[in-house]
């Protein structure tokens, strides 16, 4: 979690720099963006990217092709509820792009723009401010120093998080499934996806790796579960058992959730995403396909 912690703190530091101060003189991170500002970001995000998967349904399945840019929301004049100040838009844009060192290289990936970034229930989304377990009141960050601190314990135990040489595992019939909520506010789904792309590159390409490993992204879902606009109920274990014991690879996994009663969607193995077929009830997974 060392590097992911840098990513989380980096977002918080950007918000701290523009946040009003509390009665102790510390940044009131949760007030850097008002409730209206956060709602504006989510509404604009959905307008830009929701329908890319063929269904304007409050969920962004084609997240990699989402072209949302907070700078598009900068006020032309005075700040109102229908726009962001330049400082607010810049803080979001810089924070979500991820921390870079003095050489301009990413220390940790950025975060995708997704509906859960403004969550207020459970673990707060990244736009809300620092989570209770990551207290932070700094307004600047020495990324080089943070990266050096993170590298020390990893060097001592070995960087197992970057290992992609899994031929011994796969050759013995091992199967490996990854699942990650796109709105995870602790570990970036971009980072897991980066690892999976490297895994495929180092093990014969996507077609070869998909014979023993698949990666599923869950729009709107936060850290491990939850999300105010997510379908976070799915049986990954059953999919793994069917693959190992019956030889049935998971071409999709059906997801439901309390956020959208009566709705189901297929979770698709990366790089595919659920796409509406264009006909049929959009509440039903059967009317979507993995593309």
Feature annotation, model-predicted:
Residues 1-291:
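C-terminal His-loop and adjacent cap/lid subdomain of alpha/beta-hydrolase
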């Amino acid at each position: 979690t060392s590097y992911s912690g840098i990513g989380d703190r980096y977002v918080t530091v950007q918000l701290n720099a523009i946040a009003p101060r509390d009665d102790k003189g510390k940044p009131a991170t949760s007030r850097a963006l008002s409730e209206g500002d956060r709602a504006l970001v989510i509404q604009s995000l959905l307008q830009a990217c929701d329908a890319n998967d063929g269904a304007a349904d409050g969920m962004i399945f084609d997240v990699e092709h989402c072209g949302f840019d907070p700078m598009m929301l900068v006020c032309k004049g005075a700040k109102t509820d229908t726009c962001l100040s330049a400082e607010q838009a810049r803080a979001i844009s810089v924070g979500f792009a991820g921390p870079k060192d003095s050489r301009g290289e990413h220390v940790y990936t950025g975060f995708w723009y997704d509906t859960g970034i403004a969550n207020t229930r459970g673990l707060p989304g990244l736009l809300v401010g620092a989570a209770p377990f990551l207290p932070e009141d700094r307004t600047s960050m020495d990324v080089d120093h943070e990266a050096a601190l993170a590298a020390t314990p990893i060097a001592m135990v070995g960087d197992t998080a970057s290992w992609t040489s899994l031929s011994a595992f796969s050759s013995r019939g091992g199967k490996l499934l990854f699942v990650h909520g796109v709105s995870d506010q602790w570990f970036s789904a971009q980072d897991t996806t980066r690892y999976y792309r490297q895994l495929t590159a180092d093990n014969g390409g996507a077609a070869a790796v998909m014979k023993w490993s698949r990666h599923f992204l869950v729009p709107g879902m936060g850290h491990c579960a939850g999300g105010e606009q997510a379908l976070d109920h799915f049986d990954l274990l059953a999919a793994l058992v069917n693959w190992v014991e019956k030889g049935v690879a998971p071409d999709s996994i059906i997801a439901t959730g309390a956020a959208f009663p009566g709705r189901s969607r297929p979770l698709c193995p990366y790089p595919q995403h659920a796409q509406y077929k264009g006909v049929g009830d959009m509440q039903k997974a059967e009317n979507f396909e993995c593309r």
